[in-house]
Amino acid sequence: MSKEDMIEFSGTVTELLPNAMFRVKLDNEHMILAHTSGKMRKNRIRVLAGDRVNVEMTPYDLSKGRITFRFK
């Protein structure tokens, strides 16, 4: 799947889950399950509950996503 096919949303991390998973509440009130992207893991960017994040999702499964950016 190419990068152009991904859908981007903004949201807030509501819950930290095991195995580096997060529950994210999107701005459109949907709750999804998300994990951090590889570059965020490599650069050790911490994500905590309450952080504003960008999430990219595939159009095939709108219940899971990947956190690509954490706002300051």
Swiss-Prot record:
Where does it reside? Cytoplasm
Has the keyword Thylakoid been applied to this entry?
Answer: no
This chain's function reads: One of the essential components for the initiation of protein synthesis. Stabilizes the binding of IF-2 and IF-3 on the 30S subunit to which N-formylmethionyl-tRNA(fMet) subsequently binds. Helps modulate mRNA selection, yielding the 30S pre-initiation complex (PIC). Upon addition of the 50S ribosomal subunit IF-1, IF-2 and IF-3 are released leaving the mature 70S translation initiation complex.
Record-given protein name: Translation initiation factor IF-1
Query: What PANTHER family does this protein's entry cite?
Result: TRANSLATION INITIATION FACTOR IF-1, CHLOROPLASTIC
User: What are the S1-like domain coordinates in residue numbering?
Assistant: 1-72
Assigned keywords, A-Z? Cytoplasm, Initiation factor, Protein biosynthesis, RNA-binding, rRNA-binding
Q: Name one GO cellular component term.
A: cytosol
